[in-house]
UniProtKB/Swiss-Prot annotation:
Belongs to the melanin-concentrating hormone family. The lineage of its organism: Eukaryota, Metazoa, Chordata, Craniata, Vertebrata. Keywords: Secreted, Signal. This is Pro-MCH. Its main location: secreted. One of its GO terms (molecular function) is type 1 melanin-concentrating hormone receptor binding.
Length: 71
């Protein structure tokens, strides 16, 4: 009976231990996922800024082109 109890405790502690490892692993994975999402978001914002900068450069030349055509 004593043997069964000690092995039961061993299994219990082992399962708790492995659950703890899984939990911390999933937490760190989730954190890195958040970082990835955040970085992608920042990249997207940077691209948008470049996009608007390009548009403000292109737009005036387009306006000139339209004016040339109408005259």
């Amino acid at each position: 009976a004593k043997m069964n109890l000690s092995s039961y405790i061993l299994i219990l502690t082992f399962s708790l231990f492995s659950q703890g490892i899984l939990l911390s692993a999933s937490k760190s994975i989730r954190n890195s996922d958040d970082d990835m999402v955040f970085n992608t978001f920042r990249l997207g914002k940077a691209f948008q800024k470049e996009d608007t900068a390009e548009k403000s450069v292109i737009a005036p030349s387009l306006e000139e082109y339209k004016n040339d055509e109408s005259s």
